[in-house]
Every structure is written in C-alpha cells, then in structure tokens.
Amino acid sequence: MITIWVPKRLVEIDLYNVAACSPQQLAQLSEHSYAQRVNYAAEKIRMSGAKIVMLTGPSASGKTTSAHCIARALQQQGTPAQVISLDNFFKGAEFYPRLPDGTLDYENPDTLDLPLIKQCLRELSETGKTTLPVYDFSAEKRSDKAEPIDLQGGVCLVEGIHALNPELTGLVKGDDIYRIYAGLREEYCIDGRRVINTQDIRLCRRTLRDAGTRGRSPAKTLTMWDHVLDGETRYIKGFKTTADFLLDTSFTYELGLISNLLGVVRRQFTLEGHNAELWDETARRFEHVAPLSLDLLPPDSMLREFYGGKV
C-alpha cells in the first residue's frame, strides 16, 4: 500500500491563464515544486535504509529523468547513488512475444531477461556489486559489452516500466527494496468540467519527445499509443498500490509549452486517418490554454526530456 499518496488536482484553465501572465514566476514555481518532491523522495529513501529503489510509471511519466534527479538529490544528501535502466536487460527483438494481431508486444515483461535481473538485484542486495548487460538499441540485441556496478555503500535506482513487478525482486529481501511510482497528478478543467487529463499530457510528451530527440515520426508514435495504454493496464498499473511513494511529475507551466508546440506537429508532419483525429482532438483540448515560450525551460529541467529537442 502506498504510504506517501498524492491525490489528483483539478485546476481551472482560467486560473492557469491568469498565472501564465507572469510566465517566469509560474515556471520557477513549477520547477521548485518538482524539486521539493524529488528531495522528499530522496529523504524517504535514506530513511528506509533500502539499497535498491525500484521506480516505475506509465509511458512519458518522466520516470527515467526523475530517477536521475533523485540520484542527484541523494548524492547531495551524502548518499552515493546510481541509476540502472531495465532497458539494458532486453533479450532482443527476435525473442519478443507478439500480440494477437501479430505485432511485437513491447510492453510485455517477457521482453526482459528476468532470471538475469533477479541475479543482478540479489548480488547488489548481498554484496553491493554486480555486472550489468548493455543493450545495443541500433542492432536490437544485447551487445558484447558489460558494465560493472559498485554501490559503494549507497543506493541504486532501477527504473523501467516493469520495476514494480514482484517477479523481478523475488530473490531480494523486502527491507532492501523501496518502491516508487512516478505519475502526473494534475488535470485541467473549464467550469469544473475536466478538459485535459494526465493521459492527454503524456501523449503530447511522448509524441513531442519522439519527434524531437528519437527520430520517430508522430504518426508512428500515435499508431502505437493504444498498444501502449493496453500494456500499461496489463503490466504496470496493477502494481501501483504496492509502491511506498507516489512521485508527482506534473508541472503546471508545462500546459503552455504543449500549447505552443501542438500546431508545429500538424504543420511539419503528415497525419492521416485515426492518427489525425487523435492529434486534432488532443489539440482542441488545449485551445483555451495560453501558450508559453520554450525559453522558460531551465537547462536542468526534467521537462527537457520531452521538449528539449527540435520538433
């Protein structure tokens, strides 16, 4: 059961628009609020005495960058910390399970080398040391390289969509593990009617990130979206209540950054059929949102994962 729970907030878009009249102050307040949450998470980890932090969240929740932010906060508080990505435990595309329609099931935990994950986590728990595999994403297979890890008496943060799945941590005693679920907790309304939900924001984050930094067209991202949501329901959200800490990864001023970029995607990329309908419907939800300049993004903002590239 989550011991640190954050209820969702419903914010009037008119209230956001008033705050957006002072964009620098709104951005600073949003960034400061997130930094406080990260520091609090680091404090709770230290208090728990756990060696291993398992951190998950749905797609585009900011789990990867948040893991690195928490690691920095731990280091600033005097605790050595390293981040391990479960992506490096992928078996390789040839071993991926398939969905009923024949497409690869990227969200399935069987894409990972579960026995090796268990072994590495047990070694980290017992000795503070292990050797990690390195995945070659361009070749879509495990490389010949390996990465030695030494916690030096500190903490490792293991991030990935399956991090809270108990199959991964079955060989580690419970006291050595602290579990974090990262997710957005702020939604937006007009006269009390919800207009923009967290799923809308995550779709925008993922689409803009993939187009700006991963070379993936919005059409491809939008085509995969239903599969992504289905995978979250089947493999991620069921373990949410097992977390010790719910990390809120919302930024109020992000609403204006998205509003600024929605039209760019429509002008620069070709979208057809269902993809065009999905993007246009999402864009309509933001039509009353005052846009904000990307220049407001600090160099070290977590949001640079999503809006730091050129769309």
Describe these PLM feature segments.
Residues 82-84, 91-140:
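Conserved nucleotide-sensing/catalytic segment adjacent to the nucleotide-binding pocket
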Residues 63:
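Conserved lysine of the Walker
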Residues 1-40:
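Charged, amphipathic alpha-helical linker segments immediately N-terminal to NTP-binding catalytic cores
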Residues 66-70, 85:
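Hydrophobic positions on the alpha1 helix immediately C-terminal to the Walker A/P-loop
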Residues 72-82:
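Post-Walker A helix-loop "phosphate-sensing" segment adjacent to the P-loop in P-loop NTPases
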Residues 47-49, 118-176, 222-239:
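Glycine-rich phosphate-binding loop used to anchor ATP phosphates in small-molecule kinases
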Residues 2-3, 23, 28, 169-311:
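Conserved NTP phosphate-binding and transfer environment spanning the P-loop NTPase/kinase superfamily
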Residues 53-55:
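Hydrophobic anchor at the beta1->P-loop junction of P-loop NTPases
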